[in-house]
């Protein structure tokens, strides 16, 4: 299973952007990482979309992500 497949299986919309120098950034839409009492944005970067997805997975590993934090549909998920 590729990193993109793993992220897609969460059911959370995935945003993929081309950034400076032809590199790519990947992140979940409307999703933040819980850091104590703060919510921080996180994204993966890489030379390819797959590398960016793998970087994002590494950054989320073992952390609580918060989906739609300011809505009634807010969800907190431990990313394993």
Task: Describe these PLM feature segments.
Residues 36, 54, 68:
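Short acidic, gly/pro-rich beta-turn/loop elements at beta-sheet edges
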Residues 17, 31, 65-67:
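Assembly/interface hotspot detector across virion components, adhesins/toxins, and nucleic-acid enzymes
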Residues 45-63:
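A short, charged, amphipathic alpha-helix used as a generic interaction element across diverse proteins
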Residues 31-51:
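A short, exposed loop/beta-hairpin motif centered on an aromatic-Gly-Thr core
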Residues 2-5, 60-80:
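Short, charged, surface-exposed hinge/linker loops at domain edges
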Residues 1-25:
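Short N-terminal "domain-start" leader segments
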